[in-house]
Amino acid sequence: MAMQKIFAREILDSRGNPTVEVDLHTAKGRFRAAVPSGASTGIYEALELRDGDKGRYLGKGVLKAVENINNTLGPALLQKKLSVVDQEKVDKFMIELDGTENKSKFGANAILGVSLAVCKAGAAEKGVPLYRHIADLAGNPDLILPVPAFNVINGGSHAGNKLAMQEFMILPVGASSFKEAMRIGAEVYHHLKGVIKAKYGKDATNVGDEGGFAPNILENNEALELLKTAIQAAGYPDKVVIGMDVAASEFYRNGKYDLDFKSPDDPARHITGEKLGELYKSFIKNYPVVSIEDPFDQDDWATWTSFLSGVNIQIVGDDLTVTNPKRIAQAVEKKACNCLLLKVNQIGSVTESIQACKLAQSNGWGVMVSHRSGETEDTFIADLVVGLCTGQIKTGAPCRSERLAKYNQLMRIEEALGDKAIFAGRKFRNPKAK
C-alpha cells in the first residue's frame, strides 16, 4: 500500500527541546512517530540535525530537519510509490538519497522520523500489531516480554548532583511476568524515595530527566547502598538485581577518569582505567550488580578488553558501539563487551536498528533496548523490544509520563498475548535460550 501524504512538524521533547514528529497517511489512516534525543551522546552517533539559530530555542530548533522531510524526503518517497510494508526498501532509499556516512545531509532525526512512521503504517497494512510486524522484519517467530531496567538514581550528565556515574538501575528478574516486574519496580522505587527522604531530606527526592532521584551524594557506592536498602525494605532481595550505566566518556580526562568531574578540576584525583576497573569489581562483590554499561571511555579499547576478561557479568556498550554495525564488529573482534545498547536514533533507521541487533545476537551478545533522556510520548521501543526478543529494556524510572508510556504499552502487549506471553526473567541476557 502506497503512502498518500507525509508531513513533519516540530514538537517538544520531555526536556523542553524541539524534536521531529512525522505524520504519514495511507488508505488505512494516519500514523504518527516522534524522535527522541540524548544528553550524553557518543561521538560516533548518526547526526541529529539542529538549526543552530541561537535566537530560537537556544539553537536547538529542528526546522531544517522538518523542511528536509516536507520538501525533499517526503515528496521523493511519494513519487517512488514504495509500499509501507517494504521497510528495508524505504530505509535504503532514504539512506541512499542522503548519501552521507552519518546521515548529516537530511539529519538522522528526519530519516528516523519517517522510518518509524513507515513501520507503524506497515503493521496496520498487514493488519497485525506493531510488535508482530517488527518480529517479522527481524525473522523472529517468537515474542518475548523484557525485564525492565528502572533508572531510579540519576547522576552524571542527567543530574545536578556530584555523582559521576549516570544511572543506577533495578531489574526485577525474579518476577513471573512483566506486570509483576512493574509492580516490584514501583514498590522498590517508593521505598527508595522514603529511604532518601529520611537520610537527606525532602528536597533530595526531586527527580532527574528520566524520573530517578538525584540526591546530592558524591560516592558511587553510596547510591548502591541506597538501592540495597530500598530493595530489602520492599522485601525483594531475592527478586531484584542492580544495573549501572557509568557513561565514563563523560568524565574521561587525558587518559584518566575523574570521579569528581562536577567539581573544580584536580588532576591529582584522576584515576587510571585499571583502578576504575577494581572499583567496579568491588561493586560486583558487595552488591547484586549484574550489568555495567559504558564502564570506560568510548576509545579506551584496551581497558574494556582487559576488564571483560576478568568478570562474568553483562558489560554493555553504548557510547562504545552507538548501535553502529562497524563499531559493533570492532567490539566483537576486540572482545570489549558482551551486550549492545540499542538506540534507534543513534543509527537513524528501523532497518539498521534491526541489523545491529541481529549482528550483536549472532555473536552471542545480549541486547538491551533503550530510550533517550529527551523522550516523547511515542511508544515505538516497547513494541520493538518485544519483536526483537532482546529480553531487556531501559526506559527510565516508573515515573514521568514519557517513561511510563513505554512501560504501560508493554503491559498492554503482555495482556494482548495472554497465555502466549513469555517473560524473559532471569534469562534476560539470552532470552531465546531454551
Swiss-Prot record:
Record field: transmembrane: none
Positions bearing Phosphoserine: 83, 157, 176, 263
Matching SUPFAM superfamilies: Enolase C-terminal domain-like, Enolase N-terminal domain-like
Localization: Cytoplasm
Record key words, sorted: Acetylation, Cytoplasm, Disease variant, Glycogen storage disease, Glycolysis, Lyase, Magnesium, Metal-binding, Phosphoprotein
Known EC number: 4.2.1.11
GO function terms (MF aspect): magnesium ion binding; phosphopyruvate hydratase activity
Cofactor: Mg(2+)
This protein's GO CC annotations: cytosol; extracellular exosome; extracellular space; membrane; phosphopyruvate hydratase complex; plasma membrane
Modified residues (N-acetylalanine): 2
Top-level taxon of the source organism: Eukaryota
Active site: 210, 343
The keyword Acetylation is annotated on this UniProt entry: yes
Residue ranges of coiled coil: none
Descriptive protein name: Beta-enolase
Organism listed in the record: Homo sapiens
